[in-house]
Amino acid sequence: IKSGAIVDCTLGYGGHSGAILEQNQNVNLIACDQDEEAIKFSTERLKKFGQRAQIFKSKFSEILGKVEQGQIRGILADIGVSSLQLDKNERGFGLKSENLDMRMDVQARFSAYDVVNSYSARELERIFEGYGELPNPAKFAAKIIEARQNGEIKSAERLAQIIGLKGVNGRSVSAATLAFQAIRIEVNNELGELQNLLQSIEDSQIDECVVAIISFHSLEDRIVKNKFRQWAQSCICPPQALKCTCGGNNALGKIVSKKAVTPSTAEIKANPRSSCAKMRIFKISRGKNAR
């Protein structure tokens, strides 16, 4: 991408945004985040780029509605929690945190505390199965309900002890890690936000644009993979149709990465948390195929 604007939907602490501006001298940046602490840090970090960097406090699903779309030539989203958020005890994301928060936007009213202390057993089962892919979700929901009888659960550390730190189904990842993932996704509506972002891209007039989405677990990756496949379909007639009646020119563009791009051994060594990252890339080229 040699000109125009690139949208960094997940600004965080400015790593990707800074690299984009450093390596693309004729490109402007539009970036957003819900985390005010991250915005404050990155605003200072990117100050040297002057007006080339625009930063918004926004959900990434809403950013395209706030900016001029005509010059957008790239969209990047790095889905999930940043390492700094995980490492800050007061944010309540980590297994040893002293509180129970997990909000991306600290001004939001709904937190992990509310999920853990007010959800019914059935609601907990739903998120553990759907978002954590925990085996026997009813078992872990019951542990929380039982523990609540002795008082509110106020810390992530206590919650982790209640759920258990042993691996499940022969995996090294603990039940608590999977449960925390499920609760975090519920608190921040992470899958809904991702779906809304992809839909906002589809509904926009953005053209000749590269979309790159980095995800960290199978639920997110599946959403991205399926949406990119849908965008690449020229024919959208129902499977039972005997012949094409849609015109066969409905593709939004093409999939650039047939398989997800994964980190190299060197990248994983430098950043072990990147080991499960997957990046999928799509090139929007509406042209005569514009919907």
What are these regions (language model features)?
Residues 1-291:
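S-adenosyl-L-methionine-dependent methyltransferase catalytic core, i.e., the SAM/SAH-binding region
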